[in-house]
Swiss-Prot record:
Pfam families: Cytochrom_B_C, Cytochrome_B. Keywords: Electron transport, Heme, Iron, Membrane, Metal-binding, Mitochondrion, Mitochondrion inner membrane, Respiratory chain, Transmembrane, Transmembrane helix, Transport, Ubiquinone. Component of the ubiquinol-cytochrome c reductase complex (complex III or cytochrome b-c1 complex) that is part of the mitochondrial respiratory chain. The b-c1 complex mediates electron transfer from ubiquinol to cytochrome c. Contributes to the generation of a proton gradient across the mitochondrial membrane that is then used for ATP synthesis. Its cofactor is heme b. PROSITE patterns: CYTB_CTER, CYTB_NTER. Heme b b562 binds at residues 83, 182. The cytochrome bc1 complex contains 11 subunits: 3 respiratory subunits (MT-CYB, CYC1 and UQCRFS1), 2 core proteins (UQCRC1 and UQCRC2) and 6 low-molecular weight proteins (UQCRH/QCR6, UQCRB/QCR7, UQCRQ/QCR8, UQCR10/QCR9, UQCR11/QCR10 and a cleavage product of UQCRFS1). This cytochrome bc1 complex then forms a dimer. Belongs to the cytochrome b family. It is a multi-pass membrane protein. This is Cytochrome b. It comes from Notoryctes typhlops (Southern marsupial mole).
Length: 381
């Protein structure tokens, strides 16, 4: 009898994607984050679905409905804590996944990389509209401040902001549409993730050495299924530890107060995973300039394949590029810290210097390091 998984129309697709898929024999734990992101998305969709059953997207009852979920719904507190902290896990895996791609030159699979950047932007949009839903102080003022940035667009800005708001301020219409967006976007993300995988399977996975691994491939199952299962175990350990022991560790205390348009919190700041971009936005003392820098901080990922100057794909054997890469990683941590600080000295100047260094490293220093390493390996003297 012919094996069903190799003949059945549906099973055949799953087989080619997750079972008999030829994978490089040397991919490290940095290659675990793709599968972990898939798990994160499933967790978020499931917990989100159960939250949506009890949530009401009305300005008068939204805050109360979230309190009701935590107090009265069976395991509602757990579902909410898993969903809120699941978002943090999602972004942690995302940043590590993108960081892996930059370090090992995975961005040279251009289609896969570009879909990945679109995925990152979509997840960021989903997280932003989701943060507004509990209708606490930081939800309301975060929505007001970030949507207001669009008013910096010349000529159409103000009209655009009022169109997104559905009125002249963030109100019931805004909350309702943000709930609708937050419900539909994860399914769009799931579809994009499938496209991401389709493009990846056109070329096969990259590996730490950066050289063609075709000469030494192993089946995905059981080797990488068991490896992914171990990664999942670590992810769940971290997520459950957060959700059960300190669920509010990464949240903002201001969000325990219901939204009040007449009372502005002293420090308006987004969740931790947006702080690096928020710091770049604030480092430019001009509204339009700040918005453009904010956009550029993410969109710069799209031009990274064009800035690859090295003869080697991966940074594994490129010490100068490695040093610059880890400076970039440290710089992003500094930006994250600055984004959570008030707008006063010395934080302003630190944020401005870190923002300049961020763009300088990606656009100039890392490509130059690649050229220098080429020269050192094949000197012309």
């Amino acid at each position: 009898m012919v094996n069903l998984r190799k003949t059945h129309p549906l099973m055949k697709i799953i087989n080619h994607s997750f079972i008999d898929l030829p994978a490089p024999s040397n991919i490290s734990a940095w290659w675990n984050f793709g599968s972990l992101l898939g798990i994160c998305l499933i967790i978020q969709i499931l917990t989100g679905l159960f939250l949506a059953m009890h949530y009401t997207s009305d300005t008068y009852t939204a805050f109360s409905s979230v309190a009701h979920i935590c107090r009265d719904v069976n395991y509602g507190w757990l579902i909410r804590n898993l969903h809120a902290n699941g978002a943090s896990m999602f972004f942690m895996c995302l940043f590590l996944h993108v960081g892996r791609g930059i370090y090992y030159g995975s961005y040279l699979y251009k289609e896969t990389w570009n879909i990945g950047v679109i995925l990152l932007l979509t997840v960021m949009a989903t997280a932003f509209v989701g943060y507004v839903l509990p209708w606490g102080q930081m939800s309301f003022w975060g929505a007001t401040v970030i949507t207001n940035l669009l008013s910096a667009i010349p000529y159409i800005g103000t009209t655009l902001v009022e169109w997104i708001w559905g009125g002249f301020s963030v109100d019931k219409a805004t909350l309702t549409r943000f709930f609708a967006f937050h419900f539909i976007l994860p399914f769009i993300i799931a579809a994009l993730a499938i496209v991401h995988l389709i493009f990846l399977h056109e070329t096969g996975s990259n590996n730490p050495s950066g050289i063609n691994p075709d000469a030494d491939k192993i089946p995905f199952h059981p080797y990488y299924t068991i490896k992914d299962a171990l990664g999942l175990l670590f992810l769940l350990l971290l997520l459950l530890s957060l959700a059960l022991f300190s669920p509010d560790l990464l949240g903002d205390p201001d969000n325990f107060s219901p939204a009040n348009p007449l009372n502005t919190p002293p420090h308006i700041k987004p969740e931790w995973y947006f702080l690096f971009a928020y710091a770049i936005l604030r480092s430019i003392p001009n509204k339009l300039g700040g918005v453009l820098a904010l956009l550029a901080s993410i969109m710069i990922l799209l031009i990274i394949p064009l800035l690859h100057t090295s003869n080697q794909r991966s940074m594994t054997f490129r010490p100068i590029s490695q040093i610059l890469y880890w400076i970039l990683a440290a710089n992003l941590l500094v930006l994250t810290w600055i984004g959570g600080q008030p707008v006063e000295q010395p934080f302003i100047i630190i944020g401005q210097l870190a923002s300049i260094l961020y763009f300088l490293l990606i656009i100039l220093l890392m490509p130059l390091a690649g050229l220098f390493e080429n020269y050192m390996l094949e000197p012309k003297w």
